[in-house]
UniProtKB/Swiss-Prot annotation:
Subunit structure: Heterododecamer (2C3:3R2) of six catalytic PyrB chains organized as two trimers (C3), and six regulatory PyrI chains organized as three dimers (R2).
Keywords, comma-separated and alphabetical: Metal-binding, Pyrimidine biosynthesis, Zinc
InterPro entries xrefs: Asp_carbamoyltransf_reg_N (IPR020545), Asp_carbamoylTrfase_reg (IPR002801), Asp_carbamoyltrfase_reg_C (IPR020542), Asp_carbatrfase_reg_C_sf (IPR036792), Asp_carbatrfase_reg_N_sf (IPR036793)
Descriptive protein name: Aspartate carbamoyltransferase regulatory chain
Protein family according to the UniProt entry: Belongs to the PyrI family.
Free-text function comment from the UniProt entry: Involved in allosteric regulation of aspartate carbamoyltransferase.
Length: 154
């Protein structure tokens, strides 16, 4: 009897696979983007070996498909991630992520005086890329922040 020491994440018949997520980011994506707000099966792989990243996370959601806009919002956290649409166990579409112009209802403004932190409004940021740096400008307080500052506020 041979023993295979390699564990594999089960293939899905139909749905979305988010691959090449940096390690330790998978759970954050599940929470921020409310990916668990479904009764469909979700498979999560954490700290999986990756030639490109060293370690990576992976999320598979059955019978659920992300729009291009939803997929691009993931780029703030996982710029090199790929979002694959699966049908009948085959990849039928691969989305390469790009930064969106706006991110709404996902991030929290780090400005403690911003109205979005105390009033029932959806957060909204415009995304600006200058010289390889990504900045986010809050729609409400109009302050601009380096993207890492906003990502850490969540």
């Amino acid at each position: 009897m041979t023993h295979d020491n390699k564990l594999q994440v089960e293939a899905i018949k139909c749905g979305t696979v988010i691959d090449h997520i940096p390690a330790q980011i998978g759970f954050k994506l599940l929470t921020l983007f409310k990916l668990t707000a479904t009764d469909q099966r979700i498979t999560i792989g954490l700290n999986l070996p990756s030639n490109e990243l060293g370690r990576k996370d992976l999320i598979k959601i059955e019978n659920t498909f992300l729009t291009e806009q939803q997929a691009n919002q993931l780029a703030m956290y996982a710029p090199k991630a790929t979002v694959n649409r699966i049908d009948n166990y085959e990849v039928v579409r691969k989305l390469t992520l790009s930064l969106p112009d706006h991110i709404d209802g996902v991030l929290t403004c780090p400005n403690g005086n911003c109205i979005s932190r105390s009033e029932p409004v959806r957060s909204s940021f415009s995304v600006k890329s200058r010289g390889g740096e990504v900045h986010l400008k809050c729609r409400y307080c109009e302050k601009e922040f380096e993207h890492q500052v906003v990502l850490q506020a969540d």
